[in-house]
């Protein structure tokens, strides 16, 4: 990495991080004082492992639907293109420990799920590409490593 790039994660040395972890990427303040907190929920070790798409896709649906049951501050949660984690954006919410609890409860919801929400051609752009069991396996692995979530390096 020779020059600073516009994208924060491109400035992160992916060879130094130790997944799984939950990292505050940054805080953006709007013109009216609202603050958006963006988190890197890294599930797999970069360049060593990744989530297979059907499980990741189902985990995305399950987390997007369920995390909002645990906080009104959620703006968005979505997968990284590298398939190693998710980004979570919250508005006016700066309690890191609460974020960890929110993620934990959401992953526990995934383990209890009996179906993937919005897993149909009307509500999803690739409805044939889902795996509830794959999502639950990823969630279980992440929960098993909860003690290390706040250790990035």
Swiss-Prot record:
One of its GO terms (biological process) is quorum sensing. Signal peptide: none annotated. It comes from the Bacteria. Fe cation binds at residues 57, 61, 124. Its EC number is 4.4.1.21. It catalyses: S-(5-deoxy-D-ribos-5-yl)-L-homocysteine = (S)-4,5-dihydroxypentane-2,3-dione + L-homocysteine. GO terms for molecular function: iron ion binding; S-ribosylhomocysteine lyase activity. The keyword Iron applies. Keywords: Autoinducer synthesis, Iron, Lyase, Metal-binding, Quorum sensing. It is an enzyme of class 4 (lyase). Pfam families: LuxS (PF02664). Binds 1 Fe cation per subunit. Homodimer. Belongs to the LuxS family. NCBIfam families: PRK02260.1-4. Involved in the synthesis of autoinducer 2 (AI-2) which is secreted by bacteria and is used to communicate both the cell density and the metabolic potential of the environment. The regulation of gene expression in response to changes in cell density is called quorum sensing. Catalyzes the transformation of S-ribosylhomocysteine (RHC) to homocysteine (HC) and 4,5-dihydroxy-2,3-pentadione (DPD). This is S-ribosylhomocysteine lyase. The lineage of its organism: Bacteria, Bacillati, Bacillota, Bacilli, Bacillales.
